[in-house]
């Protein structure tokens, strides 16, 4: 952010309007300014009656002239290539720009390359997919029929689209195919959309740009009460209304009484989300209206329609529930039902007293219930599912393998071991076979044979099927009683010895039952394979699972009657034999016949499985496939990452393999001890001057004011770097990444002091303009910024912030971390140490607080420490703790000679932000402590407000100035932030490698390095963590990095991209400073268990989750070449506390990631599925380790089947990491660490997860950070008291700066030194914060005496000088009035009242400029050439006859031509006395100073004080009651010179209206009674003879309420 330019509202194109192709769509209808009631009189473009802004230059009222001008422009465009930059005349030049000046003097201005900038880039034709915002806005305002071919609705469908990222429209025949059928522009935009807040920002600025300024500016759309939209309800676009009253993508507000959050579709605003507004009917900020345009909060009018029901001021306390505080939905009802047996009074007995604690406990029990259910489900799938669906399968014995100790009967195998035949028949007591076993006795030897024919069952299923031919009763038997061998052939048969059995024993054998009162044992079924059934030597068939031996039908006894089918079956028939005949039997209705066959011919059962058993096997193998697949893919992808990708990331030095191995060995040695310094070769030496004379560097600028035109040539195109961005076609056309800030043609925002074309850098002055602009504070001893060609590592540098969050660390820990960051090899000109001390706390055993420790490590403070005051900001807390205060100390890092040798002590800028708390918490144990997340949001929100120019607190204003004063770089130049914990030591080249990755690939939005353990062998607790750290990086993160989706960037060592370049036209996309990320990450209403675990314990991982959710197509990477070391817990108690926080936050963050639909991949082959498996695996860790131990123990038990598959799976899971170590790092020592880790698996997978789940409602940091006097019962984030926003004032940077300068006396209260330029162009043109007075604010007069600050002393100008320069010169000098007050510049007008407050508001409401302050021309009322010896009073230029006019870099003055210079020439002594000031005039047109023609207005920088409006005359602006005339003596008459001059020009035409400049956005503050958006009115134009119109004598009578009169003492 340029401290002298108005910050951009978004990364919007700035200059000119969007040119159309010659064959493009017809011109769209004009945009009616929201809130205006007038309609266009001209169908093409005509001003509404109540249009509160000045029409843009070149506006013609006649339609024919408009059409003629458009046709000329289209003919010029048709001669250009489509992708070529538009000609200067193809766009409406911004007011006050150099292009407008050229258009006024020359019909063919010199074409040049446009300046590329983040803030206000030269606008190329925007390439969109679908309708542009302008077309949509025109559609909203168009009242014509949809069928009208000239209506804007038709234009909506004809918008040309050429966005290669979003696909191409159908009529773009230059492309053969569309990239994607997904149309992001057709998404439903509601508050749940991942880019809801960011798109509202963009839409908000579109409305403001189209309205020529900040019409109806609302408070921040990402702050404490998001107000989505800028235009009032009913402005013509209200027909397309989205959630919250806002138009999806356009940001139109709804009715003022609609609750914020979106028409009931979003959760209502709860406690803590109230707007930082003021009381009703009071001014929004504390300064008076003379120093800012204000929006007054007015009550809703009682006339007209009856007002609707008001919104409660605090929606969070309007409703409460008996179940629990906070939101109550299905989840909370489930938790309450689950714990209904534990009412509140019962919980209070056990110390759970507050309703918030009881809610957290109930939610914890609900989660434990779900976790238990999931573990039970996993156990059921592992062990119980097979038993349930498959059951206990009977034992089966394959036919042909039955031993001699058993016999088969009707398909069942019976054991005859120990069987003694009863004493009947041949086995009688008096026979030789008494008490023998027939299976072993001759002649039977029936062992292994089929004895079914010995126990034939007569009747039953065969009744009526087989009968005697002669009739009568059932036959005695069907077959002869013989034995049958297993191959189906006959066995022993003796007709003389009866072998048939009758009685009950027959039924028992036929049914396969266990014989009663017998030693026979049923073993199981006899099974046959399908190859046995299809054997052509046998006649077998299968019916309902039973195998039938059809050959036995040949042995049927004679005299039996049976169906003819049996005659067919007893001979082998391919239609029946060898097949499953079940279906054929059912079709032919032969069930009875085959049931009889099953009774008499069954020999066994087909070897098959039930459907349940099949399902169990499918489940088993699918699980194996997924588990083994994921494990194997992770392993191979990690190997691929280690072999082919990891060494390329950040390898800017193109190291060889030997160099990489040497560096890895040095890092391993360095990581053994936390205090061991890195090898000296990696740490750069500090530069020392060898002479007492100052040495000038070609990169440094000792005095920014000494730069002259042509001091630096533009960077040659041959210096362009070939990055991934340029290869993809998104690089800057001038080379490198799109520049955003630094003032280098084609440079990044990193090259900050190199002057060129950019318009967003704080040092963005053009060398052509001769000097830098003015800075708000003098700069002393800042580190010079190198030029764009300075590439020490082969890539363009990017400004980076090294953020260190400190809480209760020791002195040694902080010194170690800051030493490592300060001695990194990254240039000090592009890095800033930022230490945020989270409260005034003392660590256990420490005598001084953490902020004091940090302050003791600083030197050369910009402001002495004793003079630093605390400033308020809105903290991330609840209750009164939302108000917090900070002290900002800016200086340089102070080394300790005992830790860093002098030769390595570089000069590094450092800022300390110490949270000191409010006076209410001065006596607490931790005043100012708000948590690490608050420290991160403090920086993120600040960067967002800087990028979007939103209202900021006093702390953020001081933070902005501190960064500027200590670095000389504006905060918006910073692109990367490195987050480091205060107990971490960074390897010297780690920052350079991280920045190299982000510069090379703009799609990377975050990355982390490898964290090594410095105390590996201290205790057994540290030893078990070594391999766990290693494998989490080189396997888990390496696998995720292959897809660019690392799900956890550790907070101890990670880098994030603040903003990313977008396209070749200088646009920037906020990443870390994105409104959606800041809005969700700064959630202060943490009232559910899920939110508390996300935001209070796992804030680092949640930030990664938010970035992946918001930007799922961007990359999160792991860079193993960037290394740090840290101290891990060395006692089990601390480890238990740490892992409790990590495990619980992991569970809740993985749940958030599972809900992201846009992660790469599809279904099972997606990162979302991998995340789901990780979430399930984390929840069932205790059950998994229990099952693992069960499988291992079972494998060693005898007589138990060995679980082969689970053992193989276990070996793969545990063994592959060891193989990974060997094949990637070749660090054999880690194999030993792996064995130690395997022995500690019960601790990692059972003890720690169970402890974490049971303490999920504990939100304290436990033993990890011990603070003196801390109450262990206090949970982090508890609400206490009520937040009072009246102590916090929020203003825009320009308002703070204006107030500071007024109070300090640097400028008069009405100075437009920091005025903000506004234009009426639909696309905001030009830069924003330009000075319209002389940039040399301390040298208003070119002659005379000056004080020590460079200010002109009273009466310093001699009369001769005054007469030489004409009557106007005396008006410019900063002389003092008799009362001692400094007189203000005559050429600088006063601010005026807002339009609705002025007495003549109704007369000028039709065409007055909205919120403008006019910069008048010189006293001459004619555009005739000025006298050659007169200078512009507002610029304080030197006379044409100045003795210094022919100095270096200055052009001679021709007669009749007025000249100017941005900075008057001064000698060296003046420059030394004068405070160093940096640039602010980031001009898009860096041409050298030239002669100004007689018809041109005087131009300063790129702000022209004259613009012509052919259709607007001064007569349209009547006299005003409150004027803004320069201060003159009302009784004084015009001097003779004036009279003569006015008389000479009395016949000249009336001077065109001077263009005004809007100071600030002044938007209303939301209230329960609605908001009436107040617009600032315009001052009237000056009359032809301004000298004849003195201002009223009473200068205070017309001041608005609350405004302080000017001081005259």
UniProtKB/Swiss-Prot annotation:
Inducing stimuli: Expression is slightly lower in the yeast form than in the mycelium and shows a maximal expression in the log phase at about 14-18 h of incubation.
Biased segments, Polar residues type: 34-44, 100-111, 147-163, 1502-1514, 1530-1552
Reactions it catalyzes: [(1->4)-N-acetyl-beta-D-glucosaminyl](n) + UDP-N-acetyl-alpha-D-glucosamine = [(1->4)-N-acetyl-beta-D-glucosaminyl](n+1) + UDP + H(+)
One Pfam family it belongs to: CHS4
Enzyme Commission code: 2.4.1.16
Keyword Transmembrane on entry: yes
Compositionally biased tracts (Low complexity): 61-82, 253-267, 742-752, 1568-1588
Organism name: Mycosarcoma maydis (Corn smut fungus)
GO cellular component annotations of the record: cell periphery; cell septum; cytoplasmic vesicle membrane; plasma membrane
Biased composition (Basic and acidic residues): 134-146, 307-320
Topology of the protein relative to the lipid bilayer: Multi-pass membrane protein
Transmembrane segments: 327-347, 365-385, 625-645, 1177-1197, 1203-1223, 1228-1248
Family: Belongs to the chitin synthase family. Class IV subfamily.
Biological processes per GO annotation: cell wall organization; chitin biosynthetic process
Positions glycosylated per UniProt: 654, 1015, 1144
Extracellular face residues: 348-364, 646-1176, 1224-1227
Protein name: Chitin synthase 5
Molecular function per GO: chitin synthase activity
Cytoplasmic compartment residues: 1-326, 386-624, 1198-1202, 1249-1609
Subcellular location(s) per record: Cell membrane; Cytoplasmic vesicle membrane
Keyword field contains Cell wall biogenesis/degradation: yes
Keywords from the UniProt entry: Cell membrane, Cell wall biogenesis/degradation, Cytoplasmic vesicle, Glycoprotein, Glycosyltransferase, Membrane, Transferase, Transmembrane, Transmembrane helix
EC category: transferase
């Amino acid at each position: 952010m340029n401290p002298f330019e108005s910050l951009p509202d978004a990364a919007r194109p700035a200059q000119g309007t969007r040119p159309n192709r010659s064959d493009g769509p017809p011109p769209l209808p004009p945009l009616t300014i929201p809130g205006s009631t007038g309609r266009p009189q001209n169908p093409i473009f005509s001003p509404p009656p109540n249009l509160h802004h000045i029409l843009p230059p070149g506006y013609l009222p006649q339609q024919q002239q408009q059409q003629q001008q458009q046709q000329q422009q289209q003919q010029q465009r048709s001669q250009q290539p489509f992708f070529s930059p538009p000609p200067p005349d193809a766009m409406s030049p911004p007011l006050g720009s150099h292009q407008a000046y050229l258009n006024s003097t020359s019909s063919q201005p010199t074409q040049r390359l446009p300046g590329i900038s983040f803030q206000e880039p030269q606008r190329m034709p925007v390439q969109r997919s679908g309708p542009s915002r302008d077309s949509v806005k025109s559609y909203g305002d168009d009242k014509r029929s949809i069928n009208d071919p000239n209506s804007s609705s038709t234009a909506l469908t004809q918008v040309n689209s050429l966005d290669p990222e979003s696909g191409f429209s159908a009529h773009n025949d230059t492309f053969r195919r569309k990239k994607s059928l997904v149309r992001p522009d057709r998404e439903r935009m509601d508050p749940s959309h991942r880019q809801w807040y960011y798109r509202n920002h963009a839409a908000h600025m579109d409305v403001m740009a189209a309205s020529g300024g900040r019409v109806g500016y609302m408070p921040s759309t990402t702050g404490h009460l998001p107000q989505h939209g800028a235009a009032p309800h009913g402005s013509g676009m209200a027909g397309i209304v989205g959630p919250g009253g806002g138009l999806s993508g356009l940001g139109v507000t709804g009715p003022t009484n609609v609750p914020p959050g979106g028409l009931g579709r979003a959760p209502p605003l709860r406690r803590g989300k109230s707007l930082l507004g003021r009381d009703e009917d009071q001014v929004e900020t504390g300064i008076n209206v003379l120093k800012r345009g204000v929006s007054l909060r007015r009550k809703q009018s009682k006339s007209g329609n009856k007002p609707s029901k008001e919104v409660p001021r605090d929606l969070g306390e309007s409703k409460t529930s008996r179940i629990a505080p906070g939101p109550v939905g299905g989840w909370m009802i489930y938790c309450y039902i689950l714990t209904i047996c534990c009412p509140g009074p019962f919980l209070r007995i056990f110390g759970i007293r507050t309703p918030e604690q009881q809610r957290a406990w109930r939610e914890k029990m609900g989660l434990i219930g779900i976790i238990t259910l999931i573990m039970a489900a996993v156990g059921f799938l592992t062990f119980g599912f097979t038993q349930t669906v498959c059951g206990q399968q009977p034992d089966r014995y394959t036919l042909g393998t039955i031993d001699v100790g058993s016999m088969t009967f009707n398909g069942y195998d019976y054991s005859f071991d120990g069987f003694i035949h009863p004493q009947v028949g041949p086995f009688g007591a008096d026979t030789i076979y008494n008490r023998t076993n027939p299976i072993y006795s001759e002649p039977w030897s029936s062992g292994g044979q089929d004895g079914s024919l010995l126990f034939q069952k007569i009747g039953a299923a065969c009744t009526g099927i087989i009968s005697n031919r002669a009739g009568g009763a059932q036959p005695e038997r069907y077959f002869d009683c013989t034995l049958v061998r297993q191959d189906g052939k006959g066995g022993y048969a003796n007709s003389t010895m009866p072998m048939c059995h009758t009685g009950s024993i027959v039924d028992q054998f036929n049914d396969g039952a266990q014989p009663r009162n017998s030693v026979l044992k049923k073993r199981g079924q006899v099974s046959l394979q399908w190859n046995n059934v299809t054997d052509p030597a046998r006649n077998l068939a299968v019916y309902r699972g039973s195998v039938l031996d059809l050959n036995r039908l040949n042995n049927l006894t004679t005299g039996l009657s049976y169906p003819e089918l049996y005659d067919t079956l007893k001979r082998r028939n391919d239609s029946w034999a060898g097949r499953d005949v079940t279906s054929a039997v059912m079709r032919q209705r032969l069930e009875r016949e085959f049931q009889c066959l099953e009774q008499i011919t069954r020999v066994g059962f087909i070897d098959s499985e039930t459907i349940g058993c099949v399902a169990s096997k499918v489940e088993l193998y699918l699980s194996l496939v997924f588990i083994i697949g994921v494990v194997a893919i992770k392993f191979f992808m990690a190997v691929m990452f280690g072999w082919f990708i990891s060494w390329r990331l950040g390898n800017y030095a193109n190291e060889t393999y030997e160099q990489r191995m040497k560096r890895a060995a040095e890092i391993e040695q360095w990581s053994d001890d936390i205090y061991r310094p890195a090898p000296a070769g990696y740490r750069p030496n500090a530069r020392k001057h060898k002479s007492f004379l100052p040495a000038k560097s070609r990169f440094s600028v000792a005095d920014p004011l000494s730069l002259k035109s042509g001091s630096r040539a533009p960077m040659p195109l041959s210096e362009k770097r070939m990055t991934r961005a340029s290869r993809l076609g998104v690089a800057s056309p001038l080379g490198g990444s799109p520049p955003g800030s630094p003032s280098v043609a084609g440079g990044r925002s990193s090259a900050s002091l190199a002057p060129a074309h950019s318009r967003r850098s704080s040092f963005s002055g053009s060398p052509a303009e001769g000097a830098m602009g003015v800075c708000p504070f003098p700069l002393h001893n800042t580190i010079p910024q190198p030029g764009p060609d300075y590439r020490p590592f082969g890539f363009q540098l990017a400004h980076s912030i090294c953020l260190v969050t400190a809480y209760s660390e020791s002195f040694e820990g902080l010194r170690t971390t800051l030493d490592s960051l300060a001695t990194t090899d990254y240039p000090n000109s592009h890095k800033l140490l930022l230490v945020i001390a989270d409260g005034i706390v003392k660590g256990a055993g420490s005598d001084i607080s953490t902020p004091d420790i940090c302050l003791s490590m600083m030197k050369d403070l910009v402001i002495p420490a004793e003079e630093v005051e605390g400033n308020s900001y809105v903290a991330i807390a609840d209750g009164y703790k939302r108000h917090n205060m900070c002290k900002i100390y800016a200086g340089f890092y102070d080394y300790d000679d005992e830790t860093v040798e002098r030769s390595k002590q570089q000069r590094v800028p450092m800022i300390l932000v110490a949270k000191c708390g409010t006076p209410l918490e001065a006596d607490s144990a931790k005043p100012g402590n708000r948590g690490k997340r608050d420290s991160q949001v403090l920086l993120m929100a600040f960067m967002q407000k800087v990028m979007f120019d939103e209202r900021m607190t006093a702390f953020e204003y001081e933070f902005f100035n501190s960064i500027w004063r200590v670095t000389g770089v504006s905060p918006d130049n910073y692109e990367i932030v490195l987050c480091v914990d205060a107990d971490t030591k960074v390897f010297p080249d780690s920052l350079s490698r991280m920045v190299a990755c982000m510069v090379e690939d703009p799609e990377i939005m975050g990355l982390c390095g490898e964290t090594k353990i410095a105390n590996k062998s201290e205790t057994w607790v540290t030893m078990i963590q070594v391999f766990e750290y290693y494998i989490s990086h080189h396997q888990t993160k390496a696998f995720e990095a292959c897809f660019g989706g690392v799900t956890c960037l550790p907070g101890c060592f990670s880098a994030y991209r603040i903003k990313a370049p977008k396209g070749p036209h200088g646009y920037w996309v906020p990443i870390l400073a994105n409104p959606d990320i800041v809005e969700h990450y700064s959630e202060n209403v943490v009232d559910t268990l899920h939110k508390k675990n996300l935001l209070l314990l796992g804030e680092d991982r949640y930030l990664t989750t938010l970035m992946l959710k918001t930007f799922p197509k961007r990359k999160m990477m792991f860079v193993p070449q960037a290394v740090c070391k840290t101290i891990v817990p060395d006692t089990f108690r601390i480890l238990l506390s740490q892992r409790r926080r990590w495990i619980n936050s992991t569970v809740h963050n993985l749940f958030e990631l599972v809900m992201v639909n846009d992660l790469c991949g599809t279904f099972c082959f997606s990162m979302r599925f991998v995340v789901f498996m990780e979430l399930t695996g984390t929840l069932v860790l205790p059950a998994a380790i229990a099952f693992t131990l069960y499988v291992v123990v079972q494998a060693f038990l005898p007589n138990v089947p060995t679980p082969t598959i689970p053992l193989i799976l276990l070996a793969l899971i545990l063994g592959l990491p060891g193989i990974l170590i060997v094949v990637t790092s070749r660090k054999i020592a880690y194999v030993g660490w792996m064995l130690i880790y395997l022995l500690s698996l019960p601790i990692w997978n059972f003890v720690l997860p169970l402890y974490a789940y049971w303490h999920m409602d504990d939100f304290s940091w436990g033993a990890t950070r011990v603070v003196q006097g801390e109450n262990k019962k206090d949970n982090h984030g508890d609400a206490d008291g009520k937040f009072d926003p009246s102590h916090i004032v929020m203003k825009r940077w320009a308002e703070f700066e204006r107030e500071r300068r007024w109070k300090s006396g640097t400028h008069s209260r009405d100075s437009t030194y920091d005025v903000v330029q506004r234009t009426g162009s639909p696309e905001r043109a030009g830069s924003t914060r330009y000075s319209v007075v002389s940039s040399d604010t301390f040298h208003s007069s070119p002659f005379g005496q000056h004080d020590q600050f460079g200010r002109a002393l009273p009466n310093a100008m001699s009369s001769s000088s005054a007469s030489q320069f004409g009557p106007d010169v005396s008006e410019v000098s900063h002389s003092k009035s008799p009362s001692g007050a400094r007189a203000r510049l005559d050429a600088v007008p006063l601010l005026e009242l807002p339009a609705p407050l002025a007495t003549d508001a109704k007369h000028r409401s039709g065409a007055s400029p909205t919120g403008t302050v006019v910069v008048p021309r010189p006293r001459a009322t004619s555009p005739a050439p000025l006298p050659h010896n007169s200078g512009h009073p507002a610029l304080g230029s030197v006379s044409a006859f100045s003795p210094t006019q022919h100095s270096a870099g200055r052009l001679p003055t021709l007669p009749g031509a007025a000249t100017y210079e941005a900075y008057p020439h001064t000698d060296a002594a003046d420059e030394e006395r004068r405070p160093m000031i940096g640039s602010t005039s980031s001009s898009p047109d860096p041409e050298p100073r030239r002669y100004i023609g007689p018809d041109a207005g005087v131009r300063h920088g790129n702000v022209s004080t004259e613009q012509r409006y052919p259709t607007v005359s001064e007569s349209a602006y009547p006299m005003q009651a409150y004027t803004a005339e320069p201060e003159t003596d009302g009784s004084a008459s015009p001097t003779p010179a004036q009279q003569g001059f006015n008389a000479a020009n009395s016949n000249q035409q009336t001077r065109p209206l001077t263009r005004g400049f809007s100071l600030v956005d002044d938007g209303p503050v939301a209230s329960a009674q609605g908001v009436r958006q107040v617009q600032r009115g315009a001052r009237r134009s000056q009359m032809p003879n301004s000298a004849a119109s003195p201002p009223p004598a009473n200068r205070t009578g017309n001041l608005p309420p609350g405004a302080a009169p000017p001081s005259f003492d």
